[in-house]
Amino acid sequence: MNDNEPDYSVNLTIEDIRLLHHSVQETIKYWPGAPARPYEEQEHLWYMRDSLYRIMLDYRFNQL
């Protein structure tokens, strides 16, 4: 990610997080690979998947 790009914040429910996590997992599963898509995209998808999973684990630990 470029350091000059702005960061954004959004408010999401845990259901939103679960849906996004599933969507990212499916995108990784069917990712066509390079050179059809840039290889950095796959690394970013892994990062997003892991970040969303950490949120879900945090929710389970603190809310259930």
Task: Label each PLM-derived region with a short phrase.
Residues 1-64:
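Positively charged, low-complexity terminal tracts
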